[in-house]
């Protein structure tokens, strides 16, 4: 039994312009080589492009996209008796959001296009509509969990 106390859960800070935690989470995930100002530029350009495309509040589109991509359940590899089973586990809200953001950014990086802001805005709009690679990834994960329901007791 460890004598150390449990680490306190950090609350996500909000970004300077929109005062939104989701935007800040996106910025921190898109960050490469410590270039945070470039990450902010990419996100803010993507938000402007969303505003131009949909003519609605871009933050609501962002929220809707992340809510649509957030998985409820995932599979985790568990070794039992010499064989590895994919065990379905429920995911908490913060972990689900983190996964959703990771999938959205991965899908937007794979997209063909000019720059990251354009690709990210396209992926977010598609995810808000219920299509796109990130949504497909969520459905794939849910299918895997449903297929491996028999191993749920290995948790």
UniProtKB/Swiss-Prot annotation:
Disulfide cysteine pairs (residue numbers): none
An example Gene Ontology molecular-function term: rRNA binding
Matches recorded under InterPro entries: Ribosomal_uS7 (IPR000235), Ribosomal_uS7_bac/org-type (IPR005717), Ribosomal_uS7_CS (IPR020606), Ribosomal_uS7_dom (IPR023798), Ribosomal_uS7_dom_sf (IPR036823)
UniProt xrefs under Pfam families: Ribosomal_S7
Top-rank lineage group of the source organism: Eukaryota
Record-linked PROSITE patterns: RIBOSOMAL_S7
Major subcellular location class: plastid
CDD domains xref list: uS7_Chloroplast (cd14871)
GO cellular component: chloroplast; small ribosomal subunit
Protein name according to UniProt: Small ribosomal subunit protein uS7c
Keywords (A to Z) from UniProt: Chloroplast, Plastid, Ribonucleoprotein, Ribosomal protein, RNA-binding, rRNA-binding
Function recorded in the entry: One of the primary rRNA binding proteins, it binds directly to 16S rRNA where it nucleates assembly of the head domain of the 30S subunit.
Subunit structure: Part of the 30S ribosomal subunit.
Organism annotation: Aristolochia macrophylla (Dutchman's pipe vine)
């Amino acid at each position: 039994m460890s004598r150390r106390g449990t680490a306190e859960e950090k609350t996500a800070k909000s970004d300077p312009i929109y005062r939104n935690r989701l935007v800040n989470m996106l910025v921190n995930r898109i960050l490469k080589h410590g270039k945070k100002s470039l990450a902010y530029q990419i996100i803010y350009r993507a938000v402007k492009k969303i505003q131009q495309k949909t003519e609605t509040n871009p933050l609501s589109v962002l929220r809707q996209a992340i809510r649509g991509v957030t998985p409820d359940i995932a599979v985790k590899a568990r070794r039992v008796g010499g064989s590895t089973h994919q065990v379905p586990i429920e995911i908490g809200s913060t972990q689900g959001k983190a996964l959703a953001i990771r999938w959205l950014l991965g899908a937007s990086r794979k997209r063909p296009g000019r720059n990251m802001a354009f690709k990210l805005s396209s992926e977010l709009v598609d995810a808000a509509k219920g299509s796109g690679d990130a949504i497909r990834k969520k459905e794939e994960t849910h299918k895997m969990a449903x297929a491996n329901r028999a191993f749920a007791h290995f948790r």
